Structure formats: structure tokens, C-alpha cells
Amino acid sequence: MPKLGIEFDEAAQKQLEVPLGKREIYPSTGKYVAEILREQGVTIAWGVPGGHIWHFVDAISRIGIKLMIFGHEQNTVYAAEAYSQVTQKPAVAFGTVGPGTGNAFSPMQQAYLSNTPIIYLAGGIEQEHDHLYNTIQESICSEFFAHITKWAQRLFYPWSVKQFLTRGFRVAQTAPMGPVAFELGVDCLFMKDEAREHYWGGFFSQHADYVPNWRQEETTSRIKSAAAPEAIEKAAKAIFEAKRPFIILGDYGAWDQATPEIEEFINLTRIPFNTRRLGRAAVSEKHELHHRGFPKFRNEFDMMIPIGLKVGFFDGYAGGWPESVQIAPADEYIWTYVNTKAALVGNTKTVMQQLNECIKRNGYDKVSREREAWAERCKKSMAEATEARTARAYKYGPDHPRYRDNDFLHHGYMSQIIREVNDELYDSAVRVSIDGYTMSDFVMPYLQFTRPASCLTSNDNAGVGHGVGQAIGAAIGDLENGSRIPFLALMGDAGMMNAGMDIHVAVMYKLPIVYLVTNNGGWMPGMKYPWYGPNWDNLGEQDMIETEWMGVKQFGEERPTEMQRFDQMAKVFGGLEGVVCNRSENFREQLKQAYNTAEKSGPVVLDCIVDRHLVNKAVIGPVYTLMYAHLPWEELPLRGKHSRRSVLKRWFPELQKLPEMPIFDSWEPITEKEYGYEPKVDWVR
């Protein structure tokens, strides 16, 4: 056990000639903060220190909690988010007033959208200068965090700190979970506890409204609830009577550690399932009834069973779903746009236990031949889809003319090789952060996971740059749990530009991380081919490729890959290995070697030069087609015209007069005849 600071060591205090408090603040607000974190089982705090918060940051360290110090506050919260998701424990992050809390805003928003329980401890200014904007680093984060946290509270009095923080841990961990922020300003930190003697007639005790270990031995555990018995009976009967049901496992299958119960339910009922985000491998994706995505005959489903799933944008708001049994951790996760036969609300593990017991008690585990036939049909669909995906990926491998003759890779081929290597070396137990936007579309159907909380994303925040911090937080969480299986952060070059310098933290702690960068030279540069032209011709002339502006030739909205060498980060951070991969035939072995290095000695940046022609299929799909609806038809490249003709023909009646123009395949590179005119530089080809 680490040596404690003397303020936490009563035996050592008795040896002092001059009692604590005569020459320093004692007891301090920082002491109270640290004691609550220890009581709640916190072992690590993630942050960037600063003058306004040294009082409590130092105390957190002096009580024996490890400080993980970063260069930028955004990465501290991303790391805390991943750590919490991997360990299923609340995480603590901190940042100073002003720039510190401001930098934490985006990741706090992401944590709110991913329902991650983070306790954020922030600095604050003196109250007497509120809204004058003439003191140093003025901000009131309890105000600007208010709509992206479950609770944001400004604290003024030392004697109220313990009860507020204790409540904060409960609120953060109550479903739907989410971050809580506490602003501990200098008024609170610089105040002596004895001030309460002059407050409200001295009626307040040292720790008002606080009870130590308030739930006794269960203080650090989440409070669990169960579903109504009558709802369980109704749901079990409906599930038994369904002929072609399908399950979607969401995040709370992982959060509630419900793997055994959900797997038993699947085995009892013989219902095929797919998995989403953090819920991927809530039941192993090697289970015989797992189906990646939906089968082609999804219109035949007669019941949908979402378990702990946020049903929203990426699910089409349940459009086309049949009658459903919703299993949710809280009322807020019961969706009113879903045709619902029964709703079961409670801790996922507990509810699934209830449901399994009811199924066995009523003989609902004796499934019909029709259900067995349905299961077999879905198994066959999965096998065929896997075979088709494999064949499609290998089409764009080393034997494809474009990838044989050029020094860059196809995202789809890389996705298949990642799947194969992860399975060969680690039985598909590699955790992965999905960061690069283009790669996210290609790789998601290919990835296979065998342990819960393996697929880390930006959730509905849909940002980039989170993968750097997430990899660090997840790796530390795994090390705490005794695993050194490498973590794979699938970064894009934009995400690396955003957050890459904090890779130094991974280097300092020799963390087993492979930062695989799909480097295509910009913010989705492939979008120019369907929407802007090869030279970014639909932008203003000052932004087109090769135009001179202030004496400098322009690159549109991209940059040549030879100008950004992420492998060269190894020259900045000693202990980091940097590798370039630009040949398909080398990718498999280079990935294996990267894993080997990461596992044995520390992080690797694998800078993969990829085909800039390729786009996430969403770029030529309905939503992006709307986003580009302002561009004049006559100026659109061929692929953009095809997308607009296919998607918006009802909105723009003139489009219906044109011949059918099917949407292009996003896996296919641009052909020479599609350019319409010559690119001004060769690297755009």
C-alpha cells in the first residue's frame, strides 16, 4: 500500500510537535475529496493539473490514488470513458478552471451520449467576480456542463463536499448512467472548515448530510432493480409464441455484466442476435446464433427484442420494426416509437435472470420446430455473409491492379486482415477503438469480438480523436484486470492531428497499444470525387488544388500523405515505434509485428497509406446527399449526380425526367473517365 500523506495518517499525526492546522489548511477540501474517492473504490484519476485545483489533485495523490497526467484535457476524459467502459466502474477526471474545463467539453458530451459514469472535478473562480470577466481564467463549468451531464454542481463549503460527491457517484451510476460534474472553486478550497462555526448559527456538523459507507459493504456497487413480475410473464409468453424473433444487444448488456444471463436466454429460446457498440460480445460473436448485422430477410422478423439498446439515429428510429419486447435499464430507454408488446425495466442482469426463470418454469424453453428452422436459416445467412465479405475484401488485395501498381491499401482488404490476425493471435479478444471515419464503415462488419466492451466508439457524438485517449484508458483498465492483450486504435489522420500528441502517455507507461492510422491525407478527401471534383473545383477558386494564395499553392481540403508521416512521431517520443505500411502484401506481417512489439515493449504507430478515392458509403447515401443538395447539378461529378438522382428524385421533380442512375459502390475506386477533366496533381489519382 502506498505511503499516505500525513493528513490521512492519524498515527503519524500524533507524533507531531505542532498539530496539523496550525501551519497549513487542515482539514482541507482536498482531503475530503480524496477520502470520498477512496471510499468509492477509485484507484486512478485522469487529468491535467493547474493552480486552481492543486489543493485536491495533490490530496488525491497523497491518499494513494494514481494520477494519470496528460497534455490535453480532452484526452483525459476520453481515457476515463474507456477505462470505465472496460472495467464497468465509475471513472474520475479533473481539470482546472477556464481552459481546462473548456477543453473537456467535447469528451464530456461524448460521455453523456455514451452513458458513461464519470465524476468530473473542476476548478472554479472566486464567486465575487462572477460574470465580470476580469479575473483570471473565468468560467463557471457547472453552467456550461449543465446540459451534457446528469448533474452539474458548484460547491462553496468544505462541510458539504462529502455528501455532494457521495450523491454524485450514485447519480452517475443510476441508469441511464452518465457524467456528473463538480466545480470546486477557490472559495471552497481556500476556506477553513472552522468557517462553519460562523455559518447558519454554527448548526452544521463537520460533514453535513453525509454518512460514511452509506450502503455499508455495497457502497461501491450500483443499485439494482428488477422488472415487474406481470411484465416478465407477458414478455416470456410473447417471446415463446413468436416464430421469427431477433435480438439486438446494446451497451447495457456489457455495463450490467449480464453475459451469462443473456447467453442462457439465447440458448433457451434459440433466438438469433446481433450486437451494437459496447454491447458487441456481450455474448461472444463466435456464438452459433450470432449474426453480424441483419439478415437479408429482415422483413420476415415477427418480433424484435432490443436488450439495453439506445434505439436512435443509427437504428433508423426502429423504422420497419415488428412488434417488440423492450428490455431496458431505465424508463428513458423505453422508446415510444417502438410498437411494444411488453416492456421490462431494470438491471439487465437481474431482468434476464427473471426472464430465464420464467421461461423454464413455464416450459417456454421447449421451442418449436419452426423456431429451430428459423435459427438454422439465420446461421446459414451468417455463414454466407461471412464468406461473401471475405471474398469481397480479397478482391481488393495485392492482386488487384490498382493495389498491385500503387503504394497504398484498400480499407476493405485491411479490414479482413485485421479480423484474421486478431483471431489468429488473440482469439478475437483484441479491444478496438473506432476513430477513423472512412475506416469505420469498412471495418465494422469485419471485426469479431469475444469479450464484452471490446468495441469502443464515439457513440452518437460521432467525433474523431477520441481513439488516442480511449486506447490509454482501456489499456490501463485491462492491466488492472490482469490482461496485456494489445489494444487496437483505428485512427484516421484527422484524429491523429486532433489528439495524437498525448500518445506520449502510452509511451511513458509502455502500454500495449497499436495506433493504426488509415492515412488518406485529410478530412474525408474521398468526398471530393462524388461532390466537388478531383481538384476541389466546386469550392471557391482560392481553395482549389494548385491555386496560389498568398504565394502558397493550395491543397483543397486535404494534404499530400507524404507531408504527414505519423511514423516519425517515434523521433519525438523515445520508446515509441513508428512503422509505415503502403503495400497490401506486407500488411498482415506488419500488423502481427506491431502487436508483438506492443505486447512486449510498448506502443506502436502503424502509419498505413490508404486509397484516397474511397469513402464511407454514407457520403454517397441519403443523409450526405441532402447535405450536398445545395451544389449546382451541372457542376456535380458523376457519382454525385447518381446519388442525387437516386435519393432526391421526389424532392426535385426534374430529376425524374433523367434515366435511372444507381448509387455507385463505395468500395470501387474512381475510374479515369469519371474525372471529367484532368486532376492538376498526380497524388489525387
Predicted feature residues:
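Short, well-ordered beta-to-alpha junction loops that form the rim of enzyme active sites
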Residues: E183-D187, G250-Y252, D435-M439, C608-D611
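Short glycine-enriched loops at secondary-structure junctions
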Residues: G50-G51, E73-N75, I136-Q137, A330, ...
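Active-site flanking residues adjacent to catalytic metal/cofactor-binding acidic residues
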Residues: F182, I307, I327, I434, ...
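Active-site glycine- and acidic-residue-rich loops that bind
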Residues: T101, K162-Q163, D251-Q257, D407-G412, ...
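N-terminal alpha/beta PP-like core and its mobile active-site loop of ThDP/TPP-dependent enzymes
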Residues: P2-D365, V421, R484, P512-Y515, ...
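Thiamine diphosphate
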Residues: H129-Q137, T259, R298, A343-V345, ...
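Active-site diphosphate/adenylate-binding microenvironment
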Residues: G30-A34, R38-Q40, V48-D58, K379-N481
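Phosphate/pyrophosphate-binding active-site segments
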Residues: P2-I25, R196, H207-E218, R222, ...
